[in-house]
Amino acid sequence: MRGADGTEQVQSSLLRRMFDRIDHVGIAVEDLDGALALFEGTFGMPAVHRETVDEQGVEAALLDVGENHVELLRPLGADTPVGKFLAKRGPGLHHVAYQVTDIESALQRCKDAGLRLIDETPRTGIRNSRVAFLHPAASGGVLTEIVEPAH
């Protein structure tokens, strides 16, 4: 359908946004303190939170970038997902995380669409958020995290 200005119009009923916003970008690092020195000291991104997330096998730090965050991830061991990522690919972009208000609905929508999930049910993330990951094959080659913040 074309609008009055001749541009293509998409019917809003066809677009049901699953994600509210980009929550953070995750970066795998071998040395969290060294990475913090770069991101805080050089890039000027203040660290706002740091914690060990045993369930995911990482020590993580969140840095403010406007309304979003960068999440630095140091593996707690070589056999963790981030440890395996570092061994295979080295330090760098690990995932993109999108925020939702209802993670169960988002996961159901992914299942209904036939997307390959890493997590069928949410698990605990940083700051007691609820998180689940989509396999990169389901999202254009990018590891995708769905995040429902703790309330």
Predicted regions and their residues:
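Vicinal oxygen chelate
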Residues: 2, 14-17, 61-62, 71, ...
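N-terminal beta-strand motif that seeds the catalytic metal site of vicinal oxygen chelate
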Residues: 14-34, 91-100, 150-151
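Cationic, low-complexity basic patches in intrinsically disordered or flexible, solvent-exposed regions
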Residues: 9-12
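A cross-kingdom feature marking solvent-exposed beta-strand/loop segments within repeated
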Residues: 17, 21-23, 45-57, 77-94, ...
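C-terminal "cap" of GNAT-fold acetyltransferases
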Residues: 55-69
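Long, charged/polar, surface-exposed segments that mediate recognition or autoinhibition
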Residues: 89-90, 103-111
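Short, structured motif recognition centered on aromatic/hydrophobic residues
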Residues: 22-29, 36-39, 63, 70-73, ...
